[in-house]
Amino acid sequence: MLKLKGEFRTAKGLKDENKKQAQTLVFTDNQVEFKSNKQYHLRQLQQLKKKLLTLQQELEIRTQELQASYRSLLQYQSILEKQTSDLLVLHHHCKLKEDEVILYEEEMGSHSKNTGEKLHLAQEQLALAGDKIVSLERSLNLYRDKYQTSLSNIELLECQVKMLEEELSGLICQDPENKGDHSKVRIYTSPCMIQEHQETLKRLSEVWQKVSEQDDLIQELRNKLACSNSLVLEREEALIKLRADFASYTATHRHPPTSSEDCEDITKILKYLQEQKDSQCLHVEEYQNLVKDLRLELEAVSEQKKKIMKDMMKLELDLHGLREETSCVIEKKDKETVFLQYRLQDLQQQYTESQKLSLKKDKLLQDKDERLNELEKKLTQVQCLFLEKETELEKLQSTTKELDANLQEVRQSTSKIDNEGLRSEIQKLKESLEEAREQLRVSDQNLSQCKDEAHLSANNLEDAHRKLENCLLQDKRKDDVIKDLQSQLQKLQKESSETEEERKNNRQQLLELSSELNEGQRRLSSAEKEKSLLQKTLDEEEKKIDELLHGAKVSEQKQRELTNSLSKLQDELAETKRLLEEKREQLRKSKDQEKALEEEIEALRQESKKKEKMAKEQLRKLEEEKENLQAELSSCSSQLDSSINKYNNSQKVIQELNTEIARQKDSIMILQTQLDSAIQKEKNCFQNMVSKETYEELLRKSGTCQDDLTQALEKLTQATSETKSLQRNLQQTQERKAQLEDEIMAYEERMKKLNMELKKLQGFQQQSELEVHNFDKKLEEMGNQVLQWQRQHQSDLKMLAAKETQLREFQEEMTALKENLLADEKEPSLMPSKPAPKENYRHHRENDQIMCNVEQWAKEQKLANEKLGNKLREQVKYIAKLTGEKDHLHNVMAHLQQENKKLKNEIEEKKLKAGTPRICAKVLGPCKLEPSQKGKLCGALGWRGVCQDPLPKMDLTKYTGVPHCSGSSYC
């Protein structure tokens, strides 16, 4: 449009010059020439009118194009305002994300504290397990000693029983009245034992009822807990859904639609701008001063840009150093993990060896149980022999009564000579009886020793069972320790993998930065090429300007348009300054984030060091436990050797006793022969009368013999009662063994359940770790987005530099046009009239080309702004998604913490249940049973709370020796 106006003015100047020439020709030339000139001027006027019409049409077209370009510029301004608002929203979201990251770090710190407390608890449990293993081993040794002593006592009792049987077979004559007394004694002992047994059964049933009631209460409480946990989970899921809906709603309803009022405001602004076009020409000089100020500010911005680039280089160097440090730390961790794996393998081998030893011990116990069964069978046989001996004793008593009657008859017929022989024989019998009494005393002492040894064997058996339980608990705790170490190894491996992934990400970032640097260099080279092209175009335009010297008025219009463009560019510069300030703030935030990441890396290093120390301490404790176990094994082996020696000694003693028993049998046989000879002599002397003195002496001797027989019978009853008590102890030990086996099975099932729960916990922890890993990846993606924003900032700076170059070019054009105007004013225009239309046509073409270039530039800027707007919207949506996912992660972590608390509570409840056997022992303390029986009953209860079958009814006839009579008063 400016060029057209300039051409119009040049045409008017040409008209004036032609008029002046015509006037000069009128005054100088003839009228003929005046007519020819008139015709020529008329033709020129017609041509000029046609040109004016064409110029007016072109002016209208150009005005319409200018209006369209102005509208597009207003649209661009609105788009830029929206982009600034979106950038502010993004800035706010970044602040929120930083706050959320801080909260997440605090949560991770609390989680690490909880894990440390769990490790401490596990160590305490390991120490308790070690103590229990020691006690179990001691109890095992005691049980073994008791078992061996019981075997020796049983053998001694068998020997004593044989001795007594032989003595009873020697005693022939006694009263038949003693039969009923012995049966009464035997029957008297059995109902007392039955009553005590019934009382213990009643107490056991009451205790089991209480335990079952407590189990029902615990199950009800667990059901209530499960219901409350399900309600909490449902509410948490509803909260997560509401948060996601709110985030999507905020993301969708952030940009309100434009209204018709905005369009009306735009039309008003357009009218106002059209009115102020003429007034803005005067303010060109002021704008030039402003342009100078802007140049200074741009130089300052470029200096700041250089400083920022220097800071970025420093940060890259710091990153290189950090990567090297992380690589060193990863290598150390790899070495430590290998060392821990070797240690784990050693511990597993030790564990397998301990299992083998326990299997061997179980086999030995089974062998001992088989021996006990054999001994029980032998005892039953001995009892049968006792019954036979009792019948023989009764027969002997009847024979003694007959002998007394015969003696009374013989007293009347025996002589003094026979009496003297009988006296000598009776003295011999007395001596033999005294020897038998001494042997009985020795046997009583041996019986008391056997009783003491039986008590010791029972105590040793109880200690052995306790040691077995402690060993089993220690093995289980060792399994738990091995599993904990394996989980720690897995965690260390995961951490090493995470560090390797961080290294890979850092390498990728370095590659991206290097690619960005290469792209920047390429862009610089392309910018230099564009500069050269622009210089060429400038040269061409200068040539054109030389040709357009006559278009001074057109240049003035161009100045006005340039002032308008300068004002617009100033507005754009202001907006770019705002963008620069915002991006500087973003850079500062990114630096703060980098500092926070460095602090996190240091914290992770400290945590890794702490974990290493904890692992070393645990390994030391395990080594100490191993040494203690080895020492205990050595002590157990020494105790076993001593018990074997004792067993050999007891066997020797038994052999000696057997020899003594054989000797006593021989002496009894001799006495029997003597008695037979005495009976024959009495029969021979029956015919002869015996004096009163000999008769009285014989009566005395028979009374002493009867007393000796009664004492022997009492000793026999004591021996039978002791054998019965030993049999009861054996039955109780067998029942105790069965109960212990049931408890061991229950413990194994409980351990399996606990292992399953631990596996579930490990799965939950792995899921939480994966979610944390995904969240870290998302944080890295956010960092990459920050880097992209930095790149966009750099590209914006480059765009500003390009605009500065365009401003400089426009200013140079302005100065050149001013100089041309001054030159035109000084020099007179002596151009011919004919070539004017050609120059005007050339001006039109150049103006059209310039307008096309401006339109293309405007379209390119519009497309670039639209792309930026789309990118910003996508970033906003992505940030909304990240917030939703972060809330979901937070909820998942809270849920996992609740589940961990629940599992802790369940473990504490199980520990409390494990304390119930002690309570049961206190309840059953005041029982009337023997001390060994009390301990066995308390141990038989266990902590499982499972009712066991009552003891089987014993056939008392086997032990009492009473026949199953239908009509007797004793049945």
Curated annotation (Swiss-Prot):
Keyword tRNA-binding assigned to the entry: answer is no
Q: In which tissues is it expressed?
A: Expressed in testis and more specifically in ODF, the sperm tail specific cytoskeletal structure. Also expressed in epididymides and brain.
- Residues annotated as coiled-coil are 37-69, 117-229, 282-325, 355-680, 706-827, 879-916
Q: What does this protein do?
A: Required for normal spermatogenesis. It functions as a scaffold protein that attaches the sperm head-tail connecting piece to the nuclear envelope, thus maintaining sperm head and tail integrity. May also be involved in the general organization of cellular cytoskeleton.
Which Gene Ontology CC terms are recorded?
Answer: cytoplasm; outer dense fiber; sperm flagellum; sperm head; sperm head-tail coupling apparatus
Q: Where is this protein chiefly located?
A: other
> InterPro entries under this entry?
PMF1-bd (IPR037391)
Entry keyword Cytoplasm: no
Disulfide bonds listed in the record:
none
Please state the gene responsible for encoding this protein.
Answer: Pmfbp1
| Organism phylogeny | Eukaryota, Metazoa, Chordata, Craniata, Vertebrata
What GO biological process terms are annotated to this protein in UniProt? cytoskeleton organization; gene expression; protein localization; protein-containing complex assembly; regulation of protein localization; spermatid development; spermatogenesis
Alphabetically list the UniProt keywords. Cell projection, Cilium, Coiled coil, Flagellum
Localization, per the record, is: Cell projection, Cilium, Flagellum
Q: What is this protein called?
A: Polyamine-modulated factor 1-binding protein 1
Superkingdom is Eukaryota
